[in-house]
């Protein structure tokens, strides 16, 4: 490993700063106890950057990210900035430009049902008896969100709007390669989602994925139409391992997978480019209604650190230790308010961070 592994820390708005404080506890243990050569520098982003510097993504923040090996992101946005035009609000003017600037073409969204949190899932107990551990791999920079032409117009008093789904073979190839590589370290199954019975772009998607799969004979590939996949995820989520999908389909499916865990505050995510530079963040939002109350769940932010260690630093064993610490804490019955089944007995944000940190060091 290089002399220093530099992390740009962007706490942002809402609950971002307080859950990031708990992530710092883990980072400092990795630095002091596991002797990882980490260097963390903090920068403004989102609403706080608008308030202090007049723009959601300041130049010095972008420069700080460019001079780093990874980005650890909190959350951005809140009603405070709703007076701004949509393109200048934190949600649009901070995260999307970061993704574009660093060409973060892939989004990894784990959706895991923890054995001790099955009561949170909206699915029936007989459906989730075996639990599930799904990784959604979503193409992030192509597809209908970015295709041209698009527009909104009017002709002969008839209003209409249109978008264009465009995928190039190289865009599909690189996300498929990543999905298969990730599956090799899991249950060795990839399910690719498409709508190839209707869409030309999906026909190409399926053809390219089939072609790429020949490089990974140890990984089983299956295909599902997106409408059937949505149903199958609800009926039997345990059948899935890695789900590979386009930008639009991934946007939908990753949220569905998150919803059936019943605990969005537990779910991290990673967005990576071809050089393995990544942005790591919780899957949930800024939750301004509970900001500053010390009741937010910090586990998604802590598990984002785990993903950074796993995918950014390629230190699987240490990432596993972070994950195991979270599992151990849950097994012993520790809960924050959002995952507690007892409204009068739960930990504060800082308390949960302390307990996970203690498990990471001492294993108890």
From Swiss-Prot:
Subunit structure: Homodimer.
Protein name (record): 3-isopropylmalate dehydrogenase
Protein location: Cytoplasm
Species assigned in the record: Buchnera aphidicola subsp. Uroleucon erigeronensis
SMART domains from the UniProt entry: Iso_dh
Function: Catalyzes the oxidation of 3-carboxy-2-hydroxy-4-methylpentanoate (3-isopropylmalate) to 3-carboxy-4-methyl-2-oxopentanoate. The product decarboxylates to 4-methyl-2 oxopentanoate.
Catalytic activity entry: (2R,3S)-3-isopropylmalate + NAD(+) = 4-methyl-2-oxopentanoate + CO2 + NADH
Residues annotated as binding NAD(+): 78-91, 285-297
Pathway assigned to this chain's UniProt record: Amino-acid biosynthesis; L-leucine biosynthesis; L-leucine from 3-methyl-2-oxobutanoate: step 3/4
Cofactor(s) named in the record: Mg(2+); Mn(2+)
MF annotations from Gene Ontology: 3-isopropylmalate dehydrogenase activity; magnesium ion binding; NAD binding
Cofactor: record remark: Binds 1 Mg(2+) or Mn(2+) ion per subunit.
Assigned protein family: Belongs to the isocitrate and isopropylmalate dehydrogenases family. LeuB type 1 subfamily.
Record GO cellular component, one term: cytosol
């Amino acid at each position: 490993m290089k002399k220093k592994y530099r992390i740009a820390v962007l706490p942002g708005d809402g609950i971002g700063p307080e859950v990031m404080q708990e992530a710092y506890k883990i980072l400092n243990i990795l630095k002091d106890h596991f002797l990882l050569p980490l260097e963390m520098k903090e920068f403004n982003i989102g609403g706080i950057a608008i308030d202090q510097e007049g723009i959601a993504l300041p130049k010095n923040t972008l420069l700080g990210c460019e001079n780093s090996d990874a980005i650890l992101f909190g959350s951005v946005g809140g009603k405070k900035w709703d007076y701004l035009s949509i393109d200048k609000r934190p949600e649009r003017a901070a995260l999307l430009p970061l993704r574009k600037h660093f060409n973060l073409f892939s989004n990894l969204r784990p959706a895991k049902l923890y054995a001790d949190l099955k009561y949170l899932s909206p699915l029936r107990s007989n459906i989730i008896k075996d639990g599930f551990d799904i990784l959604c791999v979503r193409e992030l920079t192509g597809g209908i969100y970015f295709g041209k032409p698009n527009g909104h117009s009017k002709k002969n008093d008839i209003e209409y709007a249109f978008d264009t789904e465009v995928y190039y073979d190289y865009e599909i190839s690189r996300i498929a390669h990543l999905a298969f590589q990730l599956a090799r370290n899991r249950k060795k199954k990839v399910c690719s989602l498409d709508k190839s019975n209707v869409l030309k772009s999906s026909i190409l998607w399926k053809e390219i994925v089939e072609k790429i799969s020949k490089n990974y004979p140890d990984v089983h590939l299956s295909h599902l139409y997106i409408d059937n996949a949505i149903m199958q995820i609800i009926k039997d989520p345990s059948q899935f391992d890695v789900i590979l999908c386009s930008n639009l389909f991934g946007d939908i499916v990753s949220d569905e997978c998150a919803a059936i865990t019943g605990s969005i505050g537990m779910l991290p995510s990673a967005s990576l480019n071809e050089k393995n530079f990544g942005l790591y963040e919780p899957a949930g939002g800024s939750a301004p209604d509970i900001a500053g109350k010390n009741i937010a769940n910090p586990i998604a932010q802590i598990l984002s650190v785990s993903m950074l260690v796993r995918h950014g630093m390629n230190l699987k064993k240490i990432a596993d230790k972070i994950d195991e610490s979270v599992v151990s804490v849950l097994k012993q019955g520790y809960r924050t308010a959002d995952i507690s089944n007892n409204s009068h007995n739960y930990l504060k944000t800082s308390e949960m961070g302390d307990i996970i940190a203690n498990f990471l060091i001492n294993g108890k």
